[in-house]
Amino acid sequence: MDFGSLETVVANSAFIAARGSFDGSSTPSSRDKKYLAKLRLPPLSKCEGLRDNLSLEFESLCSEQPIGKRLFQQFLKTDERHVPALELWKDIEDYDTADDDLRPQKAQAILAEYLDPQGTLFCNFLDQGMVTRVKEGPTGSQDGLFQPLLQATMEHLSQAPFQEYLESLYFLRFLQWKWLEAQPIGEDWFLDFRVLGKGGFGEVSACQMKATGKMYACKKLNKKRLKKKKGYQGAIVEKRILTKVHSRFIVSLAYAFETKTDLCLVMTIMNGGDVRYHIYNVDEDNPGFSEPRAIYYTAQIISGLEHLHQRRIVYRDLKPENVLLDNDGNIRISDLGLAVELKEGQNKTKGYAGTPGFMAPELLRGEEYDFSVDYFALGVTLYEMIAARGPFRARGEKVENKELKQRIISEPVKYPEKFSQASKDFCEQLLEKDPEKRLGFRDGTCDALRANVLFKDISWRQLEAGMLIPPFIPDSRTVYAKNIQDVGAFSTVKGVVFDKADTEFFQEFASGNCSIPWQEEMIETGLFGDLNVWRADGQMPDDMKGITTEEAAPTAKSGMCLIS
């Protein structure tokens, strides 16, 4: 009997069972009651100091933070003066993500309901000059049609309505959630499943948050290996960038904590495996992707790169292995340990970083470079998705790094027949040796890439709203990862002793919950709805007074309601 294969089968079965529904969400039965009981809103007496330490910026509190946005909208709904602005806000967001064939009808409804003085929800706070321009402008399905109205609405809400919110019970409820969000968390909150892969400093395994049942991927960075290989800088850079960037095309960081041996990053689990695995391992007799599938992934990578570059972050390690598929078949880019953040006023950086075969000529020559190196790597990635080999070596060819460097710097790329003229031309523009001529990030956007004929069938608005159906949907019964025995194990690191500076670094790294992903988890798994209990008479809820559900039970006739 092959015990290695048996171990993989058992581990895969446990992992798939824990996943439950393949979307990675949880059900009440998958929650650990002991840890679920710890997720309880505190009495207000514990939240008194939070208001003074909290940034009271409108956009952060009421738009960016998911729980903050929900509570602010719930507050607006309780006051008829604010309902028109609330409903206009929601309807514009609905219009922005609607299918093209539904947009004209939704646009007409917005004009009639909110901009007409006879409308049921007429918004009298809007500047009439702006209203006239919107009414007289084009109508239909174009993007940004109501952007001026949305900006004006948010400006209106950030004034008196926001100040009223700050004095309301709904803001006190937000403080309760912020207190809960700030509570310490460690490895005991997570249940580990099978190893999914291995990086330079440790393993990546599937894990489950015990209180909510939500599945994640846990990247474990061995402390001794980090110190021995001088990996502290890369680890903290990756954590800082993941904390800062929130994009559907980049993995999200939900938790950061330490154990005795590891620094742990708990991130979005991508159950579909990595693109390299799909290129070579899913159909070994027919490696590579059809062109439409490769184009779809390329479009999503472009959106992810744009989000990084708009935040002045050079990725430096784009390759199929770092592009992961989620449950639905959409991709996110991962592994930002080699990324570098350009300072304000700094346009370029320098340094040897990346994976052989994916590094741009200017980087290999030791020159300064900018975001353009990532678009060269995108060209290599697109080429490999279609051809099932890199552009600078034949499949299975062993090439010394010195020879590979020379090919990248000076040799032209040859394209097999699998490439259409459009995909070849696009690849050529990405693999341009001269970074000044290379297609890429210009004037703060990737619009020049989006306009390429290769993407004529892609609706970028729907792509970025997560509305398109991917060309490949992973099988819920399959684990898209190497067998456990093929992942390999790390050797023991000896002779490493930690000092005070190391301990301080570990403590800084282990910052606990990350606000936006944590709030999203509370909403997605139903915990927000379960705990967001209000009295029907509008008075202060019992949990704010420190009265438990059991203690409040005898007076339940006074009426309670749930709002999620």
Swiss-Prot record:
Transmembrane segments: none annotated. Expressed in the retina; primarily located in rod outer segments of retina photoreceptor cells (at protein level). Also detected in cone photoreceptor cells (at protein level). Its EC number is 2.7.11.14. The active site is at D317. InterPro entries: AGC-kinase_C (IPR000961), GPCR_kinase (IPR000239), GRK1_dom (IPR037716), Kinase-like_dom_sf (IPR011009), Prot_kinase_dom (IPR000719), Protein_kinase_ATP_BS (IPR017441), RGS (IPR016137), RGS_sf (IPR036305). One of its GO terms (biological process) is protein autophosphorylation. Disruption phenotype: In rod photoreceptor cells, the light-induced ion currents do not decay rapidly, but are greatly prolonged, contrary to what is observed with wild-type mice. The retina photoreceptor layer appears normal when mutant mice are kept in constant darkness, but exposure to light causes apoptosis in retina photoreceptor cells. A lipid is attached at C561 (S-farnesyl cysteine). CDD domains: STKc_GRK1. It is a lipid-anchor. Retina-specific kinase involved in the signal turnoff via phosphorylation of rhodopsin (RHO), the G protein- coupled receptor that initiates the phototransduction cascade. This rapid desensitization is essential for scotopic vision and permits rapid adaptation to changes in illumination. May play a role in the maintenance of the outer nuclear layer in the retina. This is Rhodopsin kinase GRK1.
